[in-house]
Amino acid sequence: DDEKEIEERFYCDLVFGTAGLRGIIGAGTNRMNIYVVRKATQGLANYIIKAGKQDKGVAIAYDSRRMSPEFSMEAALCLAANGIKAYRFESLRPTPELSFAVRYLDCVAGINVTASHNPPEYNGYKVYWEDGAQITPPHDQGIMAEVKAITDFADTKTMDMVEAKKKGLLVTIGSEVDDAYMGELKKLILNQDAIDKYGKDLKIVYTPLHGTGNIPVRRILKEIGFENVYVVPEQELPDGEFPTVEYPNPEAKEAFTLALKLAKEVDADLVLATDPDADRLGCYAKDSKTGEYKVFTGNMSGSLLCEYEVSQMKEKNGSLPADGAIVKTIVTTNMVDAIAKYYGTDLIECFTGFKNIGREILRFEQTGKGTYLFGFEESYGCLIGTHARDKDAVVATMALCEAAAYYRGQGKTLWDAMMDMYEKYGYYVDDIKTVTLKGVEGSKKIGHIMNILRANVPEQVAGYKTKVVRDYRLEYIRNIETGEVKPTGFPNANVLYYELENDAWLAVRPSGTEPKIKFYYGIKGSSYDEAQKESAAFGDKVMDLIYDILEK
């Protein structure tokens, strides 16, 4: 009878955005429930039929969250009722395997029921297109328009499950796709001999954080020769309540509490955690000098994997492909730029969101120009290989363990290898500050910050001189010293990026999905400790600048 609660649940529709749906599970048009899922699927079906691709099926996966199996079945039966074959996994699977399945089964699209690392009351629905990447223009806008056009739930179709199976419109998938996916991962191993030699001695602690990673991660590690894998027992089994963590996010230190406790008990070399849909990976490794476990940021683990993969590809093949490319998002560490320069590969930048990295792979395939070597973003997601077109923490776990075996052969831990990289390329430290400004007022304030920064380019940021400003909304790049102006060559987006002296930078970006504005930044210091201090001071000064703007 709570009127406020009723209003909250029905005052608007849960918006189907560029990333699909994400919301709190419950009754109401502003919640995640079978009706909202059916409406989204009907919109997708209408788009597929209008594109004339209804003869190709749709792959469907889901994670360990509340209602995930039910929502995925609802989506499958809606597609079946529209005459589109649904290939639904028999049980929970990681996001990257869904991305793989879309292409493996020659589907037109994929649906993944997941809310990644959100709190337990949330669930979500992500759509993939036939290349296996999350939808990008023009498909995202086209599908959104079709979903929006459905104004009555009576216009959505569904079908009896038994009938759908009898008609061959609902097909259950499982071990065949699993085996094919595992086979693709094994092809990406660069140093099986290092695993054979040192993998047995390596002690690895792993937690799937109650999600989808447990079976595939343990399977791949076991099959390639890692015998000492200790799984955190309290977090091993899928559980949509995520009872042992406040927030099942491998970026959060708290998510590692139980894993680090186990690591100390078994004297592990490496501590790994995948998020509930197993597309992002967090990592700790032992510092051989002090014996303590050190945390890797997403930028650090991504850079380490990038260096390992590219250096070993070169060693194995004698050289790298002439058109070899490393892909990163614009807010990812500049250490990658230094790696690309050192190995003479192309460096391609794109906007945040892994679908944009997936889009670059598609461009390489369509044009025949560009060989994908490695891609990653700062938010703990990377992709080795092109079997999937989304972040893949299963392959990243495999590769990090392989790298740990390789460096062990040189008497080093992964942390030691990271320190060597800093010596080689410079002490790059990157971080992010987020300011939350809720409601209509908050939205105005975020707009105000962007307008002020856009109209008055700061001569310096945190004491670093501004060299180049990139305005992705006004679509220009301006060199402050020479006055030269050129186009960004990027799609339009409300993002500002300042290239500063000494390889420092700042990027400002309002979140597309939350009432937040994000400030990503990076500096390059002369030692590890000094760079950490410098980065902290830089972040404080950026916040001072922003609060000054808000007070005006």
What is each PLM-predicted segment?
Residues 128-158, 299-324, 328-339, 393, ...:
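Glycine-rich phosphate-binding loop plus the immediately following alpha-helix
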